[in-house]
Design a protein with these regions (language model features):
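Terminal amphipathic alpha-helical/low-complexity segments used for targeting or macromolecular assembly
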Residues: 1-61, 179-201
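Flexible, glycine/small-residue-enriched loop-and-beta-strand segment within the central core
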Residues: 68-78, 83-151, 177-179, 184-195
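Short alpha-helix at the nucleotide-sugar/activated-sugar donor binding site of glycosyltransferases
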Residues: 103, 156-157
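Short-chain dehydrogenase/reductase
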Residues: 139, 157, 173-175
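Short hydrophobic beta-strand element within catalytic cores of glycosyltransferases
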Residues: 164-165
């Protein structure tokens, strides 16, 4: 028998209000309540253990500042050395895969879920998900929104406030709404930082 969970995980339209999915979201919210409200910031070991339990797969080193929100949790995979600042939202119906050394600014939102444009289908409760993939060494600035089906390439920087509706290639600086590539990131950016911001005795 095909369940709504099976349909969701395979990327097909499904009814999110059905018990097999709503119960999973409730279980996730219970864990998130503890993560966001009960554990103190100083309880680092407990917080790390709980976020690793909430998410489907993580690296050894991970820090997610509270508050954090996701729908299911098990649909999210993050690599080594992941950091998300406060207010991160991951609607992970379609799955989210994040590489190593990824940095999220505050209030970053990833939305993998889509709804039908047709009103009758939408009112029946149908939805579907499309995976978001973020490569290695990516910095996503504050208040960025990344929409369903988007891939962000390695070593890319997404400027604050961007709304990412299409794939962004590797080694790019991308900004705006809708997000567009401003230019490539090169070694000149390293040299600029070293000479402008590093203290030289």
């Amino acid at each position: 028998m095909t369940t709504q969970l099976m349909l969701m995980r395979e990327g097909f339209a499904h009814l999110a209000a059905e018990p097999d999915l709503s119960d999973l979201r409730l279980h996730c919210r219970e864990m998130l309540f503890d993560y966001n409200n009960l554990l103190r910031p100083s309880e680092k070991v407990k917080k790390t253990a709980l976020i690793k339990k909430i998410l489907g797969k993580t690296g050894q080193t991970i820090k997610v500042n509270s508050p954090f929100f996701c729908d299911y949790g098990f649909q999210i995979e993050v690599g080594e050395n992941f950091f998300a600042n406060v207010g991160c939202t991951m609607l992970d119906t379609g799955g989210i895969r994040i590489g190593d050394n990824v940095l999220f600014g505050p209030n970053v939102s990833l939305y993998t879920v889509d709804h039908p444009l047709n009103v009758s289908l939408r009112n029946e409760g149908w939805e579907h998900g499309r995976k978001i993939i973020i490569g290695n060494n990516v910095w996503v600035g504050g208040s960025v929104t990344i929409l369903a089906g988007v891939t962000v390439g390695d070593n890319t920087v997404i400027g604050a406030g961007a709304v990412v509706t299409k794939d962004i290639p590797a080694n790019s600086l991308a900004v705006g709404n809708p997000c567009r590539v401003l230019r490539k990131i090169t070694d000149a950016d390293r040299q600029f930082y070293l000479t402008t911001y590093m203290k030289n005795d």
